[in-house]
Amino acid sequence: LSSKEWQLSDIGEWAAANADRIVIMPRAIAATKRSTFEQPALLFECLDLLANEYTQVKTGKADRFAFKNKADSLGLDFGGSVEPSVAGEMGDLYFVRWHGRRQFLDQHLCKGNARDPRFCMRIYFFYDEDTQKVIVGHMPSHLPTSTS
């Protein structure tokens, strides 16, 4: 699969082909198809990083540097998305329904700090211990952090 040059419009196909390693929620697929982000190869590389190294760290198959070193080499920042109190003020933006439960997209992987969606990427996700998969709820744009 990695030999194909994936475009943002291919995200549904990519998600289906990789569903055994990572889950891309329908709203993340829809937002990606509408996106103007200019580095699709980076987005797919980040999804691979979450499906591979991040999941290996979470399942104890790799130490955290396996993920951190690759994220650093791609110029990515990784961390918590927003405080739960902020997320609560934003309605359902920071939450997805997963296996009948409301789940907080508590992590994000990001590149760039400009608000311009052509140059800035955010992948909001949570890790599901039961399935041992990353669940991506929104990408590749910023989610708002206040109601202003």
Regions found by a protein language model. Give the residues of each.
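Basic, Lys/Arg-enriched alpha-helical interface segments
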Residues: 1-121, 128-148
